[in-house]
Amino acid sequence: LSKVLAERVDVTVRAFDGPRAAADIPAIPGTDPKGSLTVVGYDVPKELEDANGALKTFGVDLQIANDVDADIIHAHTWYACLAGYLAKMLHDTPLVITAHSLEPFRPWKREQLGGGYNLSSWAEKDAYEHADRVIAVSAGMREDILTAYPNLDPDKVVVVHNGITMSQFETPADDDPGWKVFERYN
C-alpha cells in the first residue's frame, strides 16, 4: 500500500525495530512518481529494555505519536494502533485502521505477553472504537470486528480485500509443470 500511495503523495512509514538503512527502503514504482516514501524506525526506549513486551511497545508508540505530522494516520495490529490513536488525539488527525487479526480472538497471546495481553487488548479496543474508519480485509473479518467491539459504529467498518502487486506475478507457460499441481488441487 505504501509503495503505491508513494507514487502519488508523500508517505512516511513509522516502524518498530530501529532505524532503517536507505538500501532497505523499497523503491517507488513508476517512472515519474509524484510523492516519496520515507521509513522512520524506532527503538524501544532504554528505560524499557527489560520491561514486559507490551510496555516496550507502548514506549515506541509514544515516540511515534509524538513525531506524527500527517494528514491521515493508517495503522494495523495493536502495536501500531495505540500509536495511531494517541497521534489522532494529540494532533487531531483522522485515523484509519486495517484489521488483519484481533486480540480478543488470540487468547494464547496471554501466555506470550502475560499481563501485557490485558494492555494489548485495551490498546486495540480503544483504537478501534475511536478510529474514523476501520478496514476489514474480508467480510468474515468485518463480522469478527463487530463481534469483538460491539460499541464500534458498523458504518465505520468497510471491507477492502488485500491487494497484490500484479507486476510481480506472471502466468506460467502452457507447458509449466506447475499447471499439473494447479489442476490437481483446483
Predicted regions: what they are:
Residues 1-31:
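N-terminal subdomain of nucleotide-sugar transferases
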Residues 17, 140, 160-163:
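Carbohydrate-associated surface elements
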Residues 29-68, 112:
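A short, charged, and often flexible helix/loop element on the N-terminal side
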Residues 73-74, 129-139:
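A short beta-strand/loop micro-motif in the catalytic core of glycosyltransferases
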Residues 75-80, 99:
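Short His-centered aromatic/hydrophobic patch
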Residues 93-96, 104-126, 173-174:
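Nucleotide-sugar donor phosphate/pyrophosphate-binding loop at the beta->alpha transition
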Residues 99-102, 161-162:
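Histidine-centered beta-alpha loop that forms part of the nucleotide-sugar donor binding/catalytic region
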Residues 170-186:
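A short helix/loop element that forms part of the nucleotide-sugar donor recognition site in Leloir-type
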